[in-house]
Amino acid sequence: MAFNLRNRNFLKLLDFTPREIQHMLELAAELKKAKYNGYEQPRLKGKNIALIFEKASTRTRCAFEVAAYDQGANVTYLGPSGSQIGYKESMKDTARVLGRMYDGIEYRGFGQEIVETLGAHAGVPVWNGLTDEFHPTQILADFLTMQEHARGKQLSEVTFAYLGDARNNMGNSLMVGAAKMGMDIRLVAPKAFWPEEELVAQCREIAEETGAKITVTEDVQEGVEGCDFLYTDVWVSMGEAKEAWAERISLMMPYQVNMAMLKATGNPHVKFMHCLPAFHGEDTVVGKELAQEYPELKDGVEVTDEVVESKHSIVFDEAENRLHTIKAIMVATLGQ
């Protein structure tokens, strides 16, 4: 069945059916294959795309820019200090201005309501590159990566655990995506870091139709047993005070992904995933500062260096797939 997603916004996975999500994943796989084999056809020739970044980025910005260039589009980058958005001009007005100049707009920033306003008033496709509540482009990359490493399983047959801060945009988005695609997800976190009950209830309602299983637990062994994938993210999100680390570490240490936890899955083929950047040693300024202040973190914070560098880690396949899935979103909503 062909899907027409042309002119649709991509703001959160709650807005899409399982079949539409699967269509975008299949398109991403096709575009990846075409790029690798040298027969990619540009379907965004003559299109102009604006990238609004109110938060810093490596993977998301690079993926959008390279995807656009591969497909023949032109890009304007508007960084945190490069525009009047929110300072002298409202997002509603910005949307109506940029929508007359550009064919598509990406937004990465703060509240979900901001990108929803942009999407409501731009009149062109708007893509969510990350908000405080959701990170939907990352989830498509994650699910494409899972498909590639699931040893023949369909997504609906996959079991995975997300460990750590399950109330953040990654916990929210993985739960929504898993519910939509009929997956078995375990959100393994201290109770204070569980997702909002309203969103959990919404996802469980979706799960009744798709066959998904959603478990929210503090019990690490219950959460990881039998998993195909273990997933984590940083314990302190962008924009949070550095002082937040102290209160998090004692709560979060039992949820650090290490080799013992991989073994606890009982699956010798288990894979490790992380949306990156990851604190897994002292090779960054933040990592070094944390290790000096908290010696127990010298081998890593949310994940140990041993895990990231092990055969179980697929984090760089996952990072590359940001490019192919973001390209699929742009082609599906804007392509000719």
Swiss-Prot record:
Its EC number is 2.1.3.3. It comes from the Bacteria. Keywords: Arginine metabolism, Cytoplasm, Transferase. L-ornithine binds at N169, D233, S237, M238. Pfam families: OTCace, OTCace_N. InterPro entries: Asp/Orn_carbamoyltranf_P-bd, Asp/Orn_carbamoylTrfase, Asp/Orn_carbamoylTrfase_sf, Asp_carbamoyltransf_Asp/Orn-bd, Orn/put_carbamltrans, OTCase_ArgI. It is found in: Cytoplasm. Pathway: Amino-acid degradation; L-arginine degradation via ADI pathway; carbamoyl phosphate from L-arginine: step 2/2. The keyword Transferase applies. GO terms for cellular component: cytoplasm. Reversibly catalyzes the transfer of the carbamoyl group from carbamoyl phosphate (CP) to the N(epsilon) atom of ornithine (ORN) to produce L-citrulline. Belongs to the aspartate/ornithine carbamoyltransferase superfamily. OTCase family. This is Ornithine carbamoyltransferase, catabolic. It comes from Photobacterium profundum (strain SS9).
